[in-house]
Regions:
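Structural signal for interior beta-strand "rungs" in well-ordered beta-sheet cores
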Residues: 1-140
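Long, leucine- and charge-enriched amphipathic alpha-helices
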Residues: 139-174
Length: 174
């Protein structure tokens, strides 16, 4: 394994419980981090220890610089994650997946094996095996492309509607 400078392995996870007095108390993080063979961890990457059990980085995982891995997360084998990505607590990332730069994943999700997450995807739902998602909120690639094409046409559609409204108004005035 290779761990580059300024990385933190085993920091406390972000665990706090609200109290009746509107303050928060720290939930003890007493778990650990397991890093398997042939893992590369880039500079300034943080991997939080689990609350009770283990945060697991499986064999062959490659983590770029500036990544946050939350408590209880498991990264599947041979998965690669680009810089400035964050994976919130208790998420399971499938094997042989690719996360582009600045991907954000909310907690407690299950991400499919052999899946791809485009740069800046905001993943808020479970994903299937072999799925490619894009956007924020993240959606399947084909759905995103259709939505994007329509989005680009919106100014023209609005102009057409305004012209039709004028014509209708003129007809009603007669």
């Amino acid at each position: 394994c290779t761990i580059h400078s300024n990385s933190v392995i085993g920091s406390d996870g972000f665990g706090f419980a609200p109290q009746e007095n509107e303050e928060f108390i720290t939930i003890p993080q007493i778990g650990n981090v397991i890093i398997k063979d042939n893992v590369s961890i880039g500079s300034n990457t943080v991997i939080d220890k689990a609350t009770i059990e283990s945060t697991i980085i499986n064999k062959g995982v490659k983590l770029d610089n500036l990544i946050q891995i939350g408590h209880n997360v498991e990264i599947g084998k041979n998965t690669v994650i680009a810089a400035q990505s964050g994976i919130s607590g208790s998420t399971k990332v499938g094997k042989n997946s690719m996360l582009g730069g600045q991907v954000g994943v909310v907690g407690h999700l299950k991400l499919g094996n052999f899946s791809k997450y485009a740069a800046q995807a905001g993943v808020s739902k479970n994903t299937k095996n072999n799925q490619t998602v894009i956007g924020s909120p993240a959606m399947p690639k084909d759905q995103f492309i259709k939505s994007y094409i329509i989005f680009k046409k919106l100014p023209s559609i609005v102009r057409q509607i305004e012209e039709l409204e004028k014509k209708l108004s003129n007809l009603q005035a007669k």
